[in-house]
Regions:
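Residue-level preference for alpha-helix termini and adjacent loops
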Residues: 6-10, 32, 40-43, 49-50, ...
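Short, basic and Ser/Thr-rich N-terminal targeting/leader segments
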Residues: 66-68, 97-100, 177, 238-241
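Extended, low-hydrophobicity, polar/charged segments
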Residues: 55, 85-89, 114, 118-131, ...
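TRNA-binding/sensing appendages of the translation machinery
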Residues: 1-82, 127-171, 255, 259-260
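Generic short alpha-helical segment signal, independent of protein family or function
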Residues: 59, 63-67, 89, 93, ...
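Conserved alpha/beta core surface patches that mediate binding of polyanionic ligands
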Residues: 5-26, 78-130, 237-238, 365-367
Length: 367
């Protein structure tokens, strides 16, 4: 490509206020991208050459799996997986004659809900690679899953990208056995955590930590109810907080440490169905008591009690009364006071938490 044909306009003056990262500034000054309007930019000739090279790499690797290309219309109302599933149901002989079927499309799609308006590299249009694999048996599907994981690793490696294989959440099925391959980038929108000393990698919503709780030998003190004389932020000692949830019509009370944050995705995975918080006006409907009279020790028998792993061995802790922020319970001992409680991991991790494999601490990264 001759330099006279590169089309590198001087757009620094126009884009200077929006470009904050050095890598973004490089893409403009070197003639890869140009401005069009907010949240839209132009791929200049150099960028098109790079895109074609990437497409060639993708196509070469997919052909190794005997994958064939198809393409839906850009503005199609159907997702590709819906179209293909419907097609195969109508014409099952396409799959019966093969142990598996591999298809892919490289498609430009319009992003309806753009969250980062004004961010230069956030575009209303994105180009996606969708790859699909259909199988007669679960064994064949599982084997091909690992082939695809290696395929995407090869694609990223050939593009000279640093990447991580990360445990993730399938948001459609809420299954936590999914993996995502994320290319490291300080400008990325994907957040994940990594162990400082091992190969543990997980998205924030599914990441776990090593439980630090140990069984205490302290004597259980009598449970008492008191009135606040000081602010919760200034109060000494360990505190619990309670959440009132439901899985369908099943009422749930869940206990966390005051400093932890509830992760509803983990609770949903525990019940294998969607779990939501109960609105204050619905408390009586699901828990049989009005909010202002709520007593967690005298709820209906069908209520399920849950506690985070860090709660299990707490002794003589405190908790604000659910019915009044002016009152609190003292000397709560979960193993004594909630004998039917089930303990599991229900919290978001925090940076610096111990890695679940016991090696190092968790560090937050972007990609």
């Amino acid at each position: 490509m001759k330099q006279s044909n590169l089309l590198i306009p001087d757009l620094q003056r126009m884009l200077g206020e929006k470009i904050t990262e050095e890598s973004q500034r490089f893409l403009v000054k070197s003639g890869f991208l140009g401005s069009f309007q907010d949240n839209q930019y132009v791929f200049l000739p150099l960028a098109m050459r790079v895109i074609e090279n990437i497409k060639n790499i993708v196509t070469e690797e997919l052909e190794k799996l005997s994958a064939v290309e198809f393409q839906l219309p850009v503005q199609s109302s159907l997702h590709a997986e819906e179209y293909l599933s419907t097609l195969l149901l109508k014409e099952p002989e396409n799959l019966q004659n093969n142990t598996s079927m591999q298809l892919y499309q490289i498609q430009t799609a319009l992003i309806a809900n753009q969250k980062k308006a004004g961010h230069f590299l956030t575009n209303f249009e994105s180009t996606y690679l969708d790859a699909f694999s259909f199988h007669e048996t679960s064994v064949s599907l599982s084997e091909n899953y690992h082939r695809y994981e290696q395929l995407f690793r090869r694609i990223l490696a050939r593009c000279d990208l640093q990447f991580q294989s990360v445990i993730a959440l399938n948001k459609e099925t809420n299954q936590q056995d999914t993996k995502e391959i994320i290319a490291d980038s300080p400008e990325g929108d994907e957040h994940y955590c990594a162990s400082s000393e091992s190969d543990y990698r997980a998205k924030i919503e599914v990441a776990t930590r090593l439980c630090s709780g140990k069984k205490s030998h302290a004597s259980y003190l009598p449970l008492v109810k008191k009135t606040f004389a000081e602010n919760i932020e200034e109060a000494q000692g360990q505190w619990l907080k309670s959440y009132f949830l439901r899985a369908g019509k099943q009422p749930i009370v869940l206990f966390l440490r005051q400093e932890d944050q509830l992760n509803l995705a983990k609770v949903t995975n525990f019940f294998k169905q969607k779990v939501v918080q109960v609105k204050p006006k619905e408390i009586e409907k699901y828990f049989g008591q009005a909010r202002e009279m709520l007593d967690v020790w005298n709820l209906p028998q069908e209520v399920t009690y849950l506690g985070d792993l860090e709660v299990e061995f707490l002794t003589n802790t405190k908790m604000i009364a659910p019915h009044s922020e002016q009152e609190y319970y003292e000397n709560i001992n979960p193993l004594r006071d909630f004998p039917n409680v089930a303990f599991a991991d229900f919290c978001f991790v925090k940076e610096g938490d111990p890695s679940p494999d016991g090696q190092g601490v968790l560090i937050f990264k972007k990609g």
